[in-house]
């Protein structure tokens, strides 16, 4: 880094309190290069209570340091305290007087203003539009309605024609001290399925202009869903609870209802994924029912019920139970596992016995060889002639 003179900032305590007997005044010397820099107070006349900290090299490659002087609180405000900085490498001299500046307390911040009411429009539930016995409803929800302007006016239109059969529910106060207002319009099943357009117009004094929201059934050619049920996996049968799966694929639009039942009674312990877009533009989903393994093994029948506008009578059902084929397969699998376990046990025992027999044979052979070798050595020592006596006799 090239030579650079420092920037100097005087630091004063920010308090009106006079309870403290002393006050700490500071001087920040920043962004200079190279070292050193000299800091004094009142041109060197003030030395008592002065503490200058070592310089610190910053990531920028420049240095900074600070100096603090402690003075009596009674003197601060009546006497002048000046920080004198001298940086000889850059020929920079700076004098800064520390002035008493008391902080003014800020008033409490007001609560952030609400931007104004927001409007949301929700379609009827798929099951409600597909069953004559149920009542489909389009719901218009207005949130963030202020106490100052609580009155909300709803106007409903079906294909551009205003209707007057909607019902507005009482206002509900929310945690943020605003109101939530809901208006519900009952619709005709076939009107919704035929793609009629529903519009909710909301007027409120907190709005610069009325807000309009429009909704209708998704446009496009309906496609019939294909439904497949899947039994629990073999690996899961070792647990106390098992999963039955229902795959629904190839349907359009995404409005669909999936439920489970057993012996005519609804099953509630199931989870269904949201419809997901497939590569061909249709939708698919999975639904998983969790049941006790004992119920499955007892042969109970579980049914996956699907409702969609493209189905005949808007309804289909696929059942699932432990069939003899599945039971036989599970039994065979268990038997096969048992046979494999028995086979591994047999192989382990055989290998163990084989190794023991090899060790035993090797030990016996070792001792036999040792005994034979010892016998041969003893025999040789017995039959060796005494050639020395024979030579003496010949002489």
UniProtKB/Swiss-Prot annotation:
Coiled coil: none annotated. Residues 1-346 are extracellular. The record marks 156 as: At or near the complement-binding site. Disulfide bonds join 27-83, 140-200, 246-304. The keyword Cytoplasm does not apply. Residues 6-99, 117-216, 225-321 form the Ig-like domain. Residues 1-98 are annotated as: CH1. Residues 111-219 are annotated as: CH2. Residues 99-110 are annotated as: Hinge. One of its GO terms (cellular component) is extracellular region. Constant region of immunoglobulin heavy chains. Immunoglobulins, also known as antibodies, are membrane-bound or secreted glycoproteins produced by B lymphocytes. In the recognition phase of humoral immunity, the membrane-bound immunoglobulins serve as receptors which, upon binding of a specific antigen, trigger the clonal expansion and differentiation of B lymphocytes into immunoglobulins-secreting plasma cells. Secreted immunoglobulins mediate the effector phase of humoral immunity, which results in the elimination of bound antigens. This is Immunoglobulin heavy constant gamma 2. It comes from Homo sapiens (Human).
């Amino acid at each position: 880094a090239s030579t650079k003179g420092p920037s100097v900032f005087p630091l004063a305590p920010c308090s009106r309190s006079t309870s403290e007997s002393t006050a700490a005044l500071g001087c920040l010397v920043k962004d200079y290069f190279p070292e050193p820099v000299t800091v004094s107070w009142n041109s060197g006349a003030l030395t008592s209570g002065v503490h200058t900290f070592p310089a610190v090299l910053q990531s920028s490659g420049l240095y900074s340091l600070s100096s603090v002087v402690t003075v009596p609180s009674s003197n601060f405000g009546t006497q002048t305290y000046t920080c004198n900085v001298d940086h000889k490498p850059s020929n920079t001299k700076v004098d800064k007087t520390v002035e008493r500046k008391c902080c003014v307390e800020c008033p409490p911040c007001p609560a952030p203003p609400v931007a104004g009411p927001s409007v949301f429009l929700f379609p009827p539930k798929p099951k409600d539009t597909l069953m004559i016995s149920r009542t489909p409803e389009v719901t218009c929800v207005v949130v963030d309605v202020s106490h100052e302007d609580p009155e909300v006016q709803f106007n409903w239109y079906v294909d551009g024609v205003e209707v007057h059969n909607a019902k507005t529910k009482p206002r509900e106060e929310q945690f943020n001290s605003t109101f939530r207002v809901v208006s519900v319009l009952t619709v005709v099943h076939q009107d919704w399925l035929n793609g009629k357009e529903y519009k909710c117009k909301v007027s409120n004094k907190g709005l610069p202009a009325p807000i309009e929201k429009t909704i209708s059934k998704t446009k496009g050619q309906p496609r019939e869903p294909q439904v497949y049920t899947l039994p629990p996996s073999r690996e899961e049968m070792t647990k106390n609870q098992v999963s039955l799966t229902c795959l629904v694929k190839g349907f359009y639009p995404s409005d669909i209802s999936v439920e489970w039942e057993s012996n005519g009674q609804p099953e509630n312990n199931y989870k269904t994924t949201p419809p997901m877009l497939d590569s061909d533009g249709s939708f698919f989903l999975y639904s998983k029912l969790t049941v006790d393994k004992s119920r499955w093994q007892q042969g109970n029948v579980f049914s996956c019920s699907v409702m969609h506008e493209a189905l005949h009578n808007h309804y289909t059902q696929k059942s699932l139970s432990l069939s003899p084929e599945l039971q036989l397969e599970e039994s065979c699998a268990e038997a096969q596992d048992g046979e494999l376990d028995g086979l591994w046990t047999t192989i382990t025992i055989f290998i163990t016995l084989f190794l023991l027999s090899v060790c035993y044979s090797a030990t016996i052979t070792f001792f036999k060889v040792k005994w034979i070798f010892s016998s041969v050595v003893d025999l040789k020592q017995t039959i060796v002639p005494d050639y020395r006596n024979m030579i003496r006799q010949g002489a």
